[in-house]
Amino acid sequence: MLMKTNKLISDLKKSLSSCNVLETLEERYAYAQDATNIKEIKNLPDVVVFVENIEQVQNVVKLANKYKTPIICRGAGTNVVGACSTEHGGIILNFSKMNKILEINRENMTARVQSGVVLGDLQNAVESFGLFYPPDPSNLAVSTIGGSIAQSSGGAKSFKYGTTKDYVIDMKVVMANGEILQTGSNTIKNATGYNLNTLFVGSEGTLGIVIEATIKLIPKPESKKVLMAYFDTVKTAVSAVNKIIEHRIFPATIDFMDKNAIQTVEKFYPANLLTDKEAALIIEIDGFECSMDYQEKIIVDILNSSDASAIQASHNEEEYNRIWTARRSSMGACAKMKPNVTTDDVIVPRKNLEKLVLGIREICEKYNLAVCMVGHVGDGSVHPQIPIDYSDEAEYKRYKLAKAEIYDLTAKLDGILSGEHGVGSLKREHINKVVNSVALDYMRQIKKTFDPNNILNPYKIF
């Protein structure tokens, strides 16, 4: 085994610049985990490779086939389901050097980018053209477009604008045999053959290696404003969500924080949040400047009629950023409570939101676990963030039991286990709770057809 690995590394150095091949124990350890930090993952990658162009990616694929070695693609490693973890060793294929925005076309309203482009950089670049790329995961300051495509990530604005899958119109993909596949076209509509874009978006690097993508853009909204409404019960908060939608007002976001999340954020990252409230909604409105007062009035009236106990509104960019920074700081705040923190991404139809939130709280209380809940409740998504100590074996066992029950509850409420994080290795043992066996069999057949040697991120999803 060691001899094979040494030969692989030697061949990689011949194909790539030696400075782009990392092989020391310390270097490999740094890339063995992603943001999930799964306790069970013990194996290190055999080698870490930084690629700079398509030809180098093809060379790595050729060698992976030769040595029957897994390839695990990595952008910033921010995913939280173990999709970048190295359970079986292999090659970490790092795309941080393929980070060029190749083209922004104002007329077509598209951008062509390499996989390593950081989402926040892309958003800032297109906004200078008066354009807008809506998907906005909380880690957009560091996460990459390649990772977003792999996990089909969304964010707060997915309620109004959709997720990554709604904006990818074309990709260049290096297949497991080294061929380059073009999945779509440079047009906004395409009904010419199968839609291969939707096959690769969310495939977690198991079907092919996305090296370049063409992204659909939309006009940048003229104005935006955020409201933070507090409630004395989860029930009234969830009820307000449905009332807003029923009134045909479509905010850019309707996000949620429960009392634990509010208090934890305020403790570690003070933001003038009201810590005595049971829940809060973060509602962003956008559009033409002339429509903002009307939208705000309608929503405030609905919130007041829904028993909102307090409403904070942004009147300038500083206040806007304060509210959103507080919401996005929840995970970081939870991380200060214990050595480890886990998050999740369960989603149910909105009619079952209250049952999901209260059910998760009951499960965590049953197993004596703290939980902070945030989420994009406009589309039914909840992120339970559980701070734990992996070195406490008893607590970790309780955590695993609680997770299984949370997934059972989600399935019972007609939900799914991931709306935007993916499955990875963390949820694969539970996927059959929400995906039927026939669908899973077809997924496995697709995987085998695209990757007969099982070298592309093996043992992820199922």
Q: How would you name each of these model-derived features?
A:
Residues 22-32, 218-219, 228-233, 238-402, ...:
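C-terminal substrate-recognition/cap domain of FAD-linked oxidoreductases
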Residues 179, 428-462:
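Activity-critical C-terminal alpha-helical subdomain
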Residues 100-255, 456:
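FAD-binding subdomain of flavoenzyme oxidoreductases
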